[in-house]
Amino acid sequence: MKQTTQLETGAEGTPDVRAGDKPAAGFARRSRPSRQAAYEPDEALSSYAAPPLQPWEEDAPRSAQPPAAPSSTLMPKAAKRMVILAIVWLVFLLFVSLKPAHAAPEAGATGETANGARASYQLHCAACHGTDRLGGIGPALLPENLSRLRKGEALKVVRDGRPATQMAGFGQALAADQLAALVDWIYTPVVPAPVWREADIRASRIQHTEPAKLPARPVFEADPLNLFLVVEAGDHHVSVLDGDRLEVIHRFPSRHALHGGPKFADGGRYVFFASRDGWVTKYDLWNLKVVAEVRAGINTRNLAASPDGRHIAIANYLPHTLVLLDGDLNLLKVLEVSDRDGKHSSRVSAVYDATPRHAFIAALKDVPEVWEISYDPAADEIPAGLIHDHAQREGAFIPGYLNPRRTQLNDPLDDFFFTQDYAELMGASREGKGQVVNLDARKKIADLPLAGMPHLGSGITWDWRGRRVMASTNLQAAEVTVIDLQSREVVRRIPTRGPGFFLRSHENSRYAFVDSMMSPEYKHVLQVIDKETLKVVHELTEQPGRTLAHVEFTRDGSYALASLWEDDGALLVFDAQTLTEVKRIPMRKPVGKYNVWNKIMREEGTSH
């Protein structure tokens, strides 16, 4: 199996822009100088085809004259019986050997199914996906890594392969029941659970390019701060889009199943990606080259980067670790994640950079704690255990640099949102419990009146009637919740078509765009909210059954780019004032797009 992918399909269709209320006059737009180059991929993936099945060899020609029968005087009756038995046995063995390799297993052979699937895997899949299923040139095939891929889609990929990839189909080599058994097997946990140690991380590092040998200036004419990186999950590529001309200037292959949140650093020159298989990639956006890669885990949630790009944090589900790297992707430290007493291990839900605090903030999935890991070498020491006197330093302390400060809570957090000063975070759990945590006092200070499953990590802020408000989608309820950040009261619940995932705006726009991608009936609809009236004023629609989601604005807020999340998808470019479509750029399932300026400046209308 070469490079199994998350396969999504959608029907073809044409856009249908449905008018709502008349759009209001827009805000003043910022102006900036506008500054494309053709590209060639750095390295094309070689095509792969499974070796053809070898026909059985025909029997060798036999002599026309049969051999003379042995003399009875030389062969006793017992010997004759043994010869006959031997001939019968040879005929049986010949029959078994000629039985097709894909024959269905005998009835009652269910106990051998796993062994058969394991044998099929080692024969057809291990060369690319690893003998231990941890991945190689193909992705890891573990339940954690396949959680976003339905078994039916996985079966289709294994049977038919994936066009334009190294993943060949095995429908001719394996029978239907063998294919089903193989897919079932890769969705079963590995026992004992796989590990990924410090030595594995160090050994996996690949240096592709020496940064010192590259020019310290962009090799293209576009504004480097108005570039978009577009993650195309359809064929595992990333496109670099000029935000002024709205044209692709470069496209390069990525690791399998990138997480949708690349992180920019060093003024936007470098960007760091994380794949679901744990691969971290450093990319030089000015020179359009991959610099280095390292595998930091087996199943990874996301990564965070300090603004100068000198420290990188990777949140893992498998193993239960938080991995810290330097800017060249060399290992600094692996933090084994567990509660304070070391009794309960935990996955890491997410990690984000808190720039004013010179620290990473991580939420734990299985333990009710939030960690703050300072990347300031001069950080204050952290008390360890009982401290009799802080002033006199009576007690045990550990270095504050790259060690966790723990905030213990009553409930774990799956998602969170920083206030503007990064002194507090607003978090939510899968059970719909919201809370406010003060990172300086390291304790919960308030509850949030949230229901359903709010997606606070996608929250945005703006000023409304003299108050600073935050708005968030909800993964279970058809609404956008608007909260006063001072009083922490809900000021409005805005009804939407269905549960949504992404909410986006820009400080130069009076509009916020929200999807309903969690709704099967309305995932093709984008709704536009007026940030002054807190009402839906417009709808943008695609053909039902397709998914329209994830908006990102250009640097000055002039245009809003939305993703048509299909393998034959596109970026839809809308005028941010008139809300009319001005351009459509074909893409292979563009799951996300990220503007350099908006990310490095922590623009209020986007997540960070």
Question: Which residue stretches match the model-derived regions?
Answer:
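Loop/turn-rich, solvent-exposed surfaces of beta-rich toroidal or solenoidal domains
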Residues: 501-569
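Residue-level detector of Asp-centered blade-edge/turn motifs that repeat once per structural unit
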Residues: 223-224, 266-267, 307-308, 355-356, ...
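Flexible coil segments in periplasmic/lumen-exposed cytochrome c-class electron-transfer proteins
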Residues: 107-115, 122, 168-234
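Short loop/turn segments that connect beta-strands within beta-propeller blades
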Residues: 243-245, 285-288, 326-330, 375-377, ...
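Surface-exposed loop and turn segments in beta-propeller and other repeat-based domains
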Residues: 335-343, 377-378, 382-409, 448-453, ...
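A short beta-strand motif characteristic of beta-propeller blades
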Residues: 247-252, 289-294, 331-341, 400-407, ...
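Extracytoplasmic electron-transfer domains, predominantly the class I c-type cytochrome c fold
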Residues: 127, 132-137, 141-191
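Repeated scaffold domains used in trafficking and secretory/extracellular systems
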Residues: 217, 258-263, 300-304, 344-352, ...
